[in-house]
Amino acid sequence: MKILIFLFLLLLSSCVFEHDAFIPKYPNSVLPDGDPIPAASRSYMEGVYKITSGGKQFGDRAVLKWHGKDFSMFSETQGCYFVMKAVHLDSVIFMEGYWRYSSNNTTGLASLRISKANGSRNILSGKDGKIVIQGTYGIADGLPDAELVLEYERPFSDKVKQSDFYIMAHRSGGRNSDNLPASENSIEMIRYTRNFGTTGIEIDVRLTKDGVPIIYHDDDLNVRTTTKSPLIGPVKNFTWLELSSYVRLIHGEKIPTLEQALTFLVDSTELRAVWLDMKGDVNAMKIVIPIQQKALARARAKAHPLEIWVGLPTEDVIDDFLSYPGHEKVTSLCELAPEDVRKVNASVWSPRWTLGTQVDLVKQMHAEGRKVFCWTIDDQQFMKKFIDEGEFDGLLSNYSAMTAFYFYTQE
């Protein structure tokens, strides 16, 4: 028996789990030779575009949306997104980056431009006008050689411009199974998630053996979430020092503490919402809520508009929340029935997506001054239906780029 156990452990330790997060790199980039697109000019590029060449790969339409000095594009096919950088050189706008499908690993390079005749002069001088984006795209690490042309169709609708809709990313951006370039629930993923059009994130909160709140989804340390380490077993069996010293997430990052994650988010992102998914540790509220309040105070001091909701997914977590002195003043999100939402006076009700659009109940929550989010919706047809026909204030998804496309293309 001892020999069998040894052989099993040897086999387990030799297993290698591949996490294919290939990102193609553009050789001989023109970007270092150009100047950044002026902040005042960027909004003139934003809007809905018609794809007149390349539609077989990406669909009929695309959305262009800036985030800081970079921008993303979103199209309907497989929740495709483009991660792009842009400069202007001699009044021509050059754009380089890569595209990828949300629902699988298909990816490739993209090289685009807006010539003087096709709108770059108007954009750079802050004027409306015709815009045609021309260029090429590739597959995998091949150089771009297939034509891609996008023609500006319209700006975002008034409905979109006036909306306070939240594009919420699951596990700070996506799951490890989605083969993204950063691990789920990592600082690096919080940095990367803006490429999906994300405006808010959900993160999972657990306590270590010595009571430090960390961001980690599973009960135990395993090959799905971490690289091989000498630590095996439930997360709660280890101190923060032990986890920090010996455990790395699948892309080499350290497991962040809740305080580290929120501090980074406040200081280094434009995200405006955080959903703390409490995983049910006993007496966690007395530790987590002060960290939530500290992060909110930091955001206010930096004039960073931010909401942080303590998630209440079970009755036990609700009981812990209600036992916290002054819980009435703590912003929370409840996943249970409307009566539970009212009992805890939650700021947000968040039912699972399989319950449907529930328009009447959503309107009741709105009448009571609450927001309503739906989780975790990844099916494209239902996502479109929920945005077009529902009254939700936000959707939580592993594929936020899909959410962004359907939201920004609303008429």
Q: What spans do the regions from the language model cover?
A:
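Sec-dependent signal peptide recognition
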Residues: 1-9
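Phosphate-group recognition and catalysis centered on beta-loop-alpha active-site segments
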Residues: 16-411
